[in-house]
């Protein structure tokens, strides 16, 4: 993927998150993770980013409820772990879901950089899964993946956008259909 900060500056727009490559794997704080990485094209960098929560402000807008719940949301960035070709042993600084970061600089996408193979062996991290429109294609597959997910958050990747929501809220609001929301 292209570097979102570069393009936000070029076209003078808001800077959005650069989370594009969910792994569907979550980790716990202090967990040791093995990551196997194939050939990285010359001049490119690859890393993992662990995304959890931020916030913690009270949802009491009138300041009348001393028992108001803390409001947290998913963070747009988190701890980053640089990867090299071969075996990488990482100790997680915090909990969260893992995203692969392979963002080329400037207009580097025009050079069509080669994909990088990354594998996290079974027994490392916990598989939560995610829905990818390009691969899974149907509401039935979405419903199956969402029903099997165990982490607090669930990721849905469409063609031009990505949702990263509370899994239980998704089960309440959209337990069996997501395609209409992706195609907004």
Residue ranges and their predicted role:
Residues 1-132:
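Beta-strand-enriched, solvent-exposed domains that form extended recognition/catalytic surfaces
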Residues 8, 68, 75, 114, ...:
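A sequence-composition feature that detects small, non-aromatic residues
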Residues 119-155:
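Low-complexity, Pro/Ser/Thr- and charge-rich linker/hinge segments at domain boundaries
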Residues 143-148, 152-184:
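Catalytic cores of extracellular degradative/oxidative enzymes
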């Amino acid at each position: 993927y292209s570097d979102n900060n570069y393009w936000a500056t070029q076209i003078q727009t808001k800077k959005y998150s650069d989370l594009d490559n969910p792994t569907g794997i979550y980790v716990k704080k202090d967990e040791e993770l093995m990551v196997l990485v194939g050939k990285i094209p010359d001049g490119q960098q690859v890393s993992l980013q662990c995304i959890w929560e931020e916030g913690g402000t009270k949802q009491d807008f009138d300041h009348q409820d001393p028992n108001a719940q803390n409001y947290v949301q998913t963070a747009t960035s988190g701890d980053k772990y640089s990867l090299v070709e071969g075996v990488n042993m990482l100790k997680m600084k915090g909990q969260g879901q893992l995203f692969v970061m392979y963002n080329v600089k400037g207009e580097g996408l025009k050079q069509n950089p080669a994909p990088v193979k990354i594998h996290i062996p079974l027994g490392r991290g916990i598989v939560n899964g995610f829905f990818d429109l390009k691969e899974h294609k149907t509401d039935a597959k979405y419903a199956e993946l969402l029903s099997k997910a165990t982490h607090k958050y669930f990721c849905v990747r469409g063609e031009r956008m990505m949702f990263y929501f509370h899994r239980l809220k998704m089960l309440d609001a959209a337990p069996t259909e997501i395609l209409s929301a992706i195609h907004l």
